[in-house]
Swiss-Prot record:
Protein name: Arginase, non-hepatic 3
Segments crossing the lipid bilayer: none
Keyword Translocase among record annotations: no
Protein encoded by which gene: arg2-c
UniProt key word Manganese: yes
Binding site for Mn(2+) 1: 122, 145, 149, 253
Function: As well as its role in the urea cycle, may be involved in tissue remodeling.
Organism (species): Xenopus laevis (African clawed frog)
The organism's taxonomic lineage, starting at the top: Eukaryota, Metazoa, Chordata, Craniata, Vertebrata
Length: 360
């Protein structure tokens, strides 16, 4: 990377930080999406409640955010929702849920909020990104996950739609997507150059083929080991923001973290992100000043073996979201009663000094 490009990035980063300091109050919409039909394991529908119970709303408020918690959406189970092609599960139910979520995310972003969607399983990202794109058609996506979620309905080995949302989003893959029941409303809204993956370490054969043959950018855990997370983020921003600033949609699956940190999730894969790597990603996204919407998905309290595992996973989810809005590891004090402009200076003499002289 040239010295000039490094200087330009540093200058843009400083300008964005100044903008963020001036705009100390983000307007944040929180939408709960308690949905689980994109996969087979019960409990992920309780993710929004677990994240809220871990103190999300208070944490965001203490960061100076104006938080509008819109509560949880209601998702209907479509009756007689037969499998597509004898493998794709709950297509009508998932399609309807994504349509409902797309509408609500679009409304929130259109009203000027940064939208936080609490999942729920990752099939929901098709809805949240579609709704976001309706308001911000030039958006880009950073997908942080152990999995690529880019199988098509014809390549999926499991039939679970939480492993397929990206294939529905990409224009380049639309000739590979059959007409799935429940998705007739859906239109692709991304090009392959609009998305970057971070944290991958469990890919199906068809996903490997798609990523390599369609030249989709991704950084696996091996890339992170070799390059370091700072370089990964620099290259990510070079691709997505190098030519122009544009809205960022962050889709963050909690299983991107190592299972030792996030045990309460449905598809854990050993060797994931450390706390420092994961939070560095979100701190750097915050510093761009371009975050417009984010998903935090796949927290599943039912799969934890102890209450401590539930707490650890939910607290980690809160830290991820909070660092998207200014929480840093140096501390983030934005409320008026915590900001210090001048350090106190002692006076030249104290009453205790005079008393000491009298005593002498």
């Amino acid at each position: 990377m040239s010295i000039r490009s490094n200087f330009v990035r540093l200058l843009k980063k400083q300008v964005n930080i100044i903008k963020l300091q001036k705009k100390c109050s983000h307007s944040v919409a929180v939408i709960g999406a308690p949905f689980s039909k994109g996969q087979k394991r019960r409990g992920v529908e309780h993710g929004p409640a677990a994240i809220r119970s871990a103190g999300l709303i208070d944490r965001l408020s203490n960061l100076g955010c104006n938080v509008c918690d819109f509560g949880d959406l209601h998702f209907s189970q479509v009756p007689n929702d037969e499998q597509y092609n004898s493998i794709v599960k709950h297509p009508r139910t998932v399609g309807l849920a994504c349509k409902v979520l797309a509408k609500e995310v679009g409304k929130a972003v259109g009203a000027g909020h940064t939208c936080v969607t609490l999942g729920g399983d990752h099939s929901l990202a098709f809805g949240s990104i579609t709704g976001h794109a309706q308001q911000c058609p030039d958006l880009c996506v950073i997908w942080v996950d152990a999995h690529a979620d880019i199988n098509t309905p014809l390549t999926t080995p499991s039939g679970n739609l939480h492993g397929q949302p990206v294939s529905f989003l990409l224009r380049e893959l639309q000739d590979k997507i059959p007409p799935i029941p429940g998705f007739s409303w859906a239109k692709p809204c991304l090009s392959k150059s609009d998305i970057v993956y971070i944290g991958l370490r469990d890919l199906d054969p068809a996903e490997q083929f798609i990523l390599k043959n369609y030249n989709i950018s991704y950084y696996s855990m091996r890339h992170i080991d070799c390059m370091g997370i700072r370089k990964v983020m620099e290259k990510t921003f070079d691709q997505l923001l190098g030519r122009r600033d544009r809205p960022i949609h962050l889709s963050f699956d909690i299983d991107a973290f190592d299972p030792a940190l996030a045990p309460a999730t449905g598809t854990p894969v050993i060797g994931g992100l450390t706390y420092r790597e994961g939070v560095y990603i979100t701190e750097e996204i915050h510093n761009t000043g371009m975050l417009s919407a984010l998903d935090l998905v796949e927290v599943n309290p039912v799969l934890a073996t102890t209450s401590e595992e539930v707490k650890a996973t939910a607290n980690l989810a809160v830290d991820v979201i909070a660092s998207c809005f200014g929480q840093t590891r140096e501390g983030a004090h934005t409320r008026a009663d915590t900001i210090i402009d001048v350090l106190p200076t002692p006076s030249t003499s104290y009453e205790s000094d005079n008393e000491e002289q009298v005593r002498i």
